[in-house]
Amino acid sequence: GSEMCIRDRDGRLAYQVDYKGTPVINPSTLGLELKGATSLMDGFKVVKTSTSTFDETWQPVWGETKDIRNHYNELLVELEQPSTTRFMNIRFRVYDDGVGFRYEFPQQKNLVYFVIKEEHSRFAMTGDHTAWWIPGDYDTQEYDYTESKLSEIRGLLQGAVSDNASQTVFSPTGVQTSIQLKTADGVYLNLHEAALVDYSCMHLNLDDKNLVFESWLTPDAQGNKGYMQSPCHTPWRTVIVSDDAREILASNLILNLNEPCKYDDTSWIKPVKYVGVWWEMIAGGKP
């Protein structure tokens, strides 16, 4: 299964993910850059850590399986930035098939309303993996997937941008999530997110010299990437791991990290068939 360890790198928190005793995510730093304020990147001290275990079985309204088991070990790291007297927590959940983590901001007088300039969550790869990716684009996901080594993304990205009316490719090494990866040892990785609510969608930008992915959030018209009011939290960042590619697709990790259904009565929710009129318009009824 999956394991995770946390370390303090000169006041900056880093995490590592192992699978069956072998690293699949090398030590990767975490933090957020704020607009017009001291960033939540470093200068932290660990105030408290706590662990817990959770195990439940729940039923989705509709889905591939009737019952879904939500079983994880949790680590909550409570941080203080003494120079600003601000507090931030990072919550990690470790499943058999991967991990999820998110930033949490408790209610506090020195961090109430704040604007995120960029989130700097890193995912350090352990090698030049094979990747299945589409270009990082704020406006469309309608691309064919490209299979290549991580080191080849830069050279292939422009050729992977198909003709489309709305395109904003943000970086020569930017890709969208979810991204699927395969190591030389046959271990599969998937990087994505869960519980995306009132926050920007996460893309990934690759440092192709060091083979490190870093989160890259979709901006608004002013270039801001998140408007926050504590107490609040970010979406979960997810890493699914397996030596069987089919298990990546079968994983319930993201479903388990999504927020529970808020409707008391779900009897009115029914699956339906949908005919896409948009495709009828642009394809002219061609098969």
Pin down the residues of each PLM region.
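Conserved catalytic cores of very large enzyme subunits
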Residues: 265
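N-terminal accessory beta-strand-rich subdomains and adjacent acidic, glycine-rich linkers
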Residues: 2, 7-262
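Substrate-binding cleft of carbohydrate-active enzyme catalytic domains
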Residues: 268-287
